[in-house]
Amino acid sequence: MRLFVLTRHAHSTLNREGRVNGDPGVSGPLTPEGKGQAEHLGVQLSALPVDLCVYTRFGRTLETAELALAGQTVPRVVEPLLDDVDVGELEGATLEEYRAWKHEHRRDEPFPGGESLDDAALRYAKAFRKLLARPERTVLVVCHEIPVRYALNAAAGSDDLDGPEHAVSNATPYLFDDGALERAAERVEQITRSGRRAQPKRGE
């Protein structure tokens, strides 16, 4: 059996400030608390023979991976398809501002200057399929809250990618076998595409 360990990066300065970040060029290093979380993740993974580590273009994911895998010679690969959602002009906004925008707009509407949540969801499904196509047996995937949340809810068969698993803790390992990750990819695609067909145009 193959194993994919999906985890959100450890606690970052942007988490501490309660601000959103979808631009990998913006710095958001781990806090002292986050560094401790990443090291504890390494302890949790110590019994697993990790063959590959996949992380995103955001520095906090690489920093988490390096601390979790300290002392190990595990190959590492950057996967931009798992990058956090590009929120465009909402870069640096508070979580309250971000949630207010989401509440007022449909999932297929892009953030001003960014991408839509639907586009991000399909990107994540593509990333899951890309992971499934790899030959390694045990893969650590250090990414962000939204792709992990979508994978958890989709694999469980939920009709809502944002629930029932709403909160994804920092540096917590979530285990998926081939079947679970395949179900996640299929369900994310199904929900997103059916939602696009079902959503009425404004004024209807």
Roles of regions detected by a PLM:
Residues Y55-T56, L122, V142-C143:
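Short beta-strand scaffold positions
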Residues F4, R137-E145:
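Generic beta-sheet signal
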Residues S46-P49, L131-R137:
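Glycine-rich phosphate-binding loop signature in dinucleotide/nucleotide-binding domains
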Residues M1-R2, Q44, V85-E96, N153-E204:
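Acidic, low-complexity terminal tails and accessory targeting/binding regions
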Residues L67, Y150-A154:
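Active-site signature of alpha/beta-hydrolase-fold catalytic machinery across serine-
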Residues L14, G28-P29, A70-K126, E165, ...:
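Phosphate-handling substructures
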Residues R2-L3, T7-Q72, E115:
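Active-site-proximal alpha-helix that buttresses catalytic centers in soluble enzyme cores
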Residues S12, P147-V148:
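Short active-site segment of divalent metal-dependent hydrolases/proteases
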